[in-house]
């Protein structure tokens, strides 16, 4: 059953006039169909892996203070506890560098081996498909997804009772891989509630199992 989303006031310096970018990306349709229709198969997996393998070498050059602001704000105001934290879609480590400063028990996971090869050795790395996580039921206190596809059934399986999900889109509604906080809560099985906010050029949702 979907729970409520409580929006916090925008952080100081939030960018509200975002250029049209991600809403026209083919990844937007992939994001929505994967979250709501479970439309993920070996062909789509291979195409997404190839896409991100090809972008890995210069992926870190996309980092800007405005994009990172949403990650920092989510960690500051999201209110989710740590414990065992797994970052899904860790890429080359844009979020990982901030997460390792907050959480002692962190695993960085990505579908793209090339992304992981370009990521600094900040945390243990796992190359895997987030639709079939190599972790037992209830293994995580917190999952962190920065510009990452949402696989609701696996989130529901891996997050412990009382655990949570931190969902971050660093370009807000213009992030190619974007779902609104309301859509994230709606997609998840079971009962969840969320706190959401905007900072820099991005938005985030701290989603708690209830």
Label each residue range with its predicted role.
Residues 196-210:
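Core SAM-dependent methyltransferase catalytic element
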Residues 131-143:
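A short acidic, Gly/Pro-enriched loop at the edge of an enzyme's catalytic core
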Residues 4-80, 82-91, 166-187:
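Conserved class I S-adenosyl-L-methionine
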Residues 152-164:
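A short glycine-rich, Lys/Arg-flanked "PGG" loop and its adjoining helix->strand segment in the class I
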Residues 141-153:
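A short SAM/SAH-binding and catalytic strip from SAM-dependent methyltransferases
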Residues 91-132:
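Class I SAM-dependent methyltransferase SAM/SAH-binding core
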